[in-house]
Amino acid sequence: MKPKELEFCNKNGVKLTEIKVGYDGIVIANSKKGILLKISKSDLGKALTAKIPQNGKWIDNPYKNWNEINPSLPNLPIRVYGPPTTSGTRASFVELVNQKGYCAKDKDAKAASLGRGDKKGKKCRAMRTDGAFIEAGEQDNLIVQKLNEDPNAYGIFGFSYLDQNSDTLQGAEISNTAPTFENIASNNYSVSRALYIYVKHQHIGVIPGLKKFLENWKLNWSEDGILSDAGMIPMSETEREKYAKAIEELPVLTADILK
C-alpha cells in the first residue's frame, strides 16, 4: 500500500491491518531454445523505459537490439512481452527495474532534468510503446505461449509461471543472480516483492468467515503449505511468527509502519 492510499483510507475513517503473507519474484524469461539473458538491472531498465537521457534531455528510447545497450548482450531485437498498466506485476517491475534499477543508478539518467515531484517517477516508470515492449494482457499463460512460439522474445511475469513451465522456459540472470526459489526467499534476487493482505477493521465480526480466512493463511504459508506449492515464496519462520501475531492482535496500520 502506498502512503497516499493509506491517507485516503484515513480520511474516510477506514482502519486497516497490513499482513505480509510471502514473497514473489518477477522474472524475465524466454524459451530454452533461445539465448539465456544475463543482464544488469540498470541495462534492463534502459532497454525498456520509454525515454532515455541524451545531452541532459530525455528522448524516445532509440535502442533496437540488446547489444546496442551493452556489447555483452545478444545481437537480437529487443522484444519483450509483459503485463498491462493495470497489473500489480507491471507496477512492481517498473518501480524495481526502470525507476530504482536504471533511473536511480545510471549517471546520465541522474544528471538529466526530470521535473518536480512525481514527474520523475512517472517518466522513469513509463514503458516503451514502439514494439520493443508489448502488452500481452493479464493472462501470463498467453505470454508463455508467445515465448514458446518465438525463441528470440522475452516475457515478464511472476516466478510461479517460470516454475510451472521450467521444462520449456529459462529465467534471465539479473545482476548475476538467477531467479530461483532459494534466491528469492533469501532476498538475493533483487526483482522481488513482498505480498500483503489488508484487513478492514469495520469488517471484523461483520463479514462471515473472515476470522477463518485469516487463520487459513497461517496454516498454509510455510515451506510445506499449499501456497508454496502454488508458487508463493514463504517468509522466514521469524516473519511468519511476527505476522501470525498481527493476525491475532490486528494492529492499526499507520504511516510510520509503511516507511
List the predicted regions and their residue ranges.
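Flexible loop/hinge segments at secondary-structure junctions
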Residues: 1-259
